[in-house]
Amino acid sequence: MREKLSPHVRALLEAVDAEGRPPVEELSLQEARQAALEGTRKLGGEPEPVALVEDVRIAGPAGMIPLRIYTPEGKAPNPALIYFHGGGWVVCNLDTHDVVCRALARRS
């Protein structure tokens, strides 16, 4: 299966395998969440600066939904991008994808 993946993705998976961590399905929920946070921080590098980061909550059909708004440097109006990453709707969260979202905000 991995032979069908791009060389970059294969290298990423090999780096994760080399750490010798147990498979995510063998971890408790809390362990899986911590591993995801550590892994994304390690692979993502330092977060890039943006003009403003705001954490807000909006009402959803099953309760409040956390959102993070990234405002890039420069004059408005700015483009809008909505980034959904469910992480299986269990493991990942706003912090695990902060580096990615900051990079998207700066380059959009």
Residue ranges and their predicted role:
Residues 58, 78, 94:
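Short clusters of hydrophobic/aromatic residues that line enzyme substrate/ligand-binding pockets
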